Amino acid sequence: MSRFPKLALLASPGEPARKAERQLREIHEFVPIEEADAVIALGGDGFLLQLLHRLLEQRRDLPAYGMNLGTIGFLMNNWNPDDLVNRLERAKSITVMPLMATIEATSGQRFTLPAINEVSLLRETRQAAKLQIDV
């Protein structure tokens, strides 16, 4: 018996991911993510990171298996519709331990958000930015 008897399937909006989603739905039966034991993510790194953030916000400890159908894909497995259940069973599990980033805007408003993979800082002006980073 599989460790993940109930799988959910999510795909990014891009056509390659949507095409792969249709292909997998013809082969396998999937459940809504709320009922799943694991989730298959079709897309790129950004899509997988969005999914991980969503799971963190919902406080769900749900394994995610990503297959690259996006632009980057460093965090993803190669796309292959064959033998999905066995690939999941053989996949090496990695636990993500996100850092919590507390951000204070110039208005004084503070935000605390999980930081997974990377943090990007963008400025709206050409003036020098003053940053304080505490780890």
Predicted features and spans:
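Short glycine/serine/threonine-rich phosphate/pyrophosphate-binding segments
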Residues: 46-52
